[in-house]
Amino acid sequence: MLIPWQDLSPETLENLIESFVLREGTDYGEHERTLEQKVADVKRQLQCGEAVLVWSELHETVNIMPRSQFRE
């Protein structure tokens, strides 16, 4: 089930994004990015619709994924 990111408080959204970024592991790119930069990138992706917040009833968890990978 999709969760509209706009319905979350700014603090809750920030915490969800930080948790997601920290779970994603190490960035092996040419330049290391700060947590703040990664959080800003994910927030931008949510705002422009490239990424979505998804609630899993089975696992009772929230995840962030590319919109193209989401299937209802």
Swiss-Prot record:
It comes from the Bacteria. Disulfide bonds: none annotated. Gene3D superfamilies: YehU-like. Pfam families: UPF0270 (PF06794). Coiled coil: none annotated. InterPro entries: UPF0270, YehU-like_sf. NCBIfam families: PRK04966.1. Belongs to the UPF0270 family. This is UPF0270 protein YheU.
